[in-house]
Regions:
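Active-site-proximal beta-strand/loop segments in catalytic clefts of secreted hydrolases
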Residues: 11, 19-21, 57-59, 91-95, ...
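Short, solvent-exposed aromatic-acidic interface loops
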Residues: 20-27, 60-61, 181-193
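His/acidic metal-ligating clusters that form di-metal
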Residues: 39-55, 65-106, 128
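Short catalytic/ligand-binding loop motif for oxyanion handling, primarily in non-cytosolic enzymes
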Residues: 1-5, 16, 25-26, 62-64, ...
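Conserved hydrophobic/aromatic beta-strand scaffold that supports enzyme active sites
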Residues: 5-7, 40-44, 56, 165-167, ...
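Short coil/turn motifs at secondary-structure junctions
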Residues: 59-62, 217-219
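Metal-dependent phosphoester-hydrolase catalytic domains
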Residues: 79-89, 96-222
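Structured beta-strand-rich core segments of catalytic domains in phosphoester-bond hydrolases
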Residues: 1-51
Length: 222
């Protein structure tokens, strides 16, 4: 994809597609130099002789929940068409921040209110119709524990904890799921003399990684 989307797999990739998402924000108007628009990368993997559909997704942050719903529905329709009848894992930064990323006043209001900050972690589905749309098509969102995956810096210092990154599972049952901190101090697994061991920044990313172990071909109880 043109916006950094990719699928990395230890299993053979049999087929792959790029799905263009409906535009919900024009990044060109302020002369940001970009190639293409938001997209998702879908692929079919061969996991020990069993097919598995996967997708790498990055939804728009500078829009409201309805805009993100329209974008995710485009991915859900593509998965139905391209990956029918097989287990599917859709994952990525869905930007489910519970507000319109263009609304600076709303961001300041949330930053100053502990009650509003809690909604960004605990009540995401009430404000983000994309998650409801996925559930309606038999996808299960993980991690289910309300935990931040994004540290959004605030103008006055500090950061706003957001829950933006998800795995959406169809035909899969998660046995466990969690997030992995990308703060450099938490990355104690670096091999000596590796690029990670030499990295001197405060964090590898402002998003934490989302991780899950799943069983294939087991119908979700939900």
């Amino acid at each position: 994809g043109f916006h950094g989307n990719a699928v990395f797999s230890r299993w053979p990739i049999r087929r792959a597609w790029t799905v263009r998402l409906p535009e919900q924000y024009n990044w060109y108007f302020d002369r940001q130099r970009r190639i293409g628009g938001r997209c998702a990368v879908l692929a079919e993997l061969d996991v020990g002789g069993r097919p598995l559909g996967v997708a790498s997704i990055h939804l728009e942050n500078r829009t409201h929940g309805e805009g993100r719903r329209l974008q995710l529905e485009a991915v859900l329709r593509a998965a139905e068409e391209l990956l029918p009848g097989i287990p599917v894992v859709l994952g990525g930064d869905l930007n489910t921040n519970t507000f319109d990323g263009r609304d600076k006043d709303a961001i300041r209001e949330i930053a100053g209110s502990p009650a509003l900050q809690r909604r960004c972690l605990e009540d995401v589905a009430q404000y983000e119709a994309a998650l409801t749309a996925a559930e309606a098509m038999a996808y299960r969102a993980v991690p289910e524990t309300p935990i931040l995956t994004r540290r959004k810096p605030l103008p006055g210092g500090g950061c706003l904890g957001l829950r933006l990154d998800w795995l959406l599972l169809r035909g899969m049952t998660p046995t466990k799921s969690r997030t992995l901190s990308t703060r450099t101090a938490d990355c104690g697994f670096a091999r000596p003399d590796s690029a990670l061991a030499r990295f001197a920044g405060e964090e590898l990313s402002d998003h934490n990684a989302v991780w899950a172990a799943c069983r294939m071909g087991v119908k979700d109880a939900k």
